[in-house]
Design a protein with these regions (language model features):
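N- and C-terminal low-complexity/disordered segments
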Residues: 2-5, 19-132
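Bacterial N-terminal signal peptides
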Residues: 9-17
Length: 132
């Protein structure tokens, strides 16, 4: 290998060590919901792939990532929110990524309800951590 090739190989190897750590997938999403009519705020834990009902909304988190502790804190969730009203076809209100650190970046735009991501966690590790 010539000198230039060696320099490129070393530079590439060093750049890999500077990349941020990959986010860890989690199995549970922590959401907060707001009913704007009653001003009631609720915190809900939803397993990924499970649908919950909040008012007329059906909320289904599809994927949840949480950055490792050595990185800047961030939880990101791919979520689908469908509104089901009586005598109407279900309407997709939101489908996309929501970020715990920036709730306004990709928010649900609904006149009655707000939904935002608080965190992601693994239910199995949480049970172990809380055991005395």
């Amino acid at each position: 290998m010539n000198r230039r090739g060696l320099t490129i190989a070393i530079g590439f190897a060093l750049s890999l060590s500077a990349l941020p750590a990959a986010a860890d997938p989690a199995d549970t999403v922590i959401l907060e919901t707001l009913d704007k009519i009653s001003a009631r705020v609720s915190r809900v834990e939803v397993p990924v792939g499970t649908t919950i009902t909040f008012g007329s909304l059906k909320i289904t988190p599809r994927h949840c990532d949480k950055r490792p502790p050595e990185e800047t804190p961030e939880s990101s969730v791919f979520i689908e929110i469908i509104e089901e009203l009586p005598d109407a076809q279900p309407k997709l209100e939101f489908s996309g990524w929501m970020f715990a650190s920036s709730p306004a970046l990709s928010a649900l735009d609904h006149p009655v309800y707000d939904v935002w991501v608080v965190d992601c966690k693994n239910a199995s590790t949480s049970a172990i951590e809380t055991t005395p």
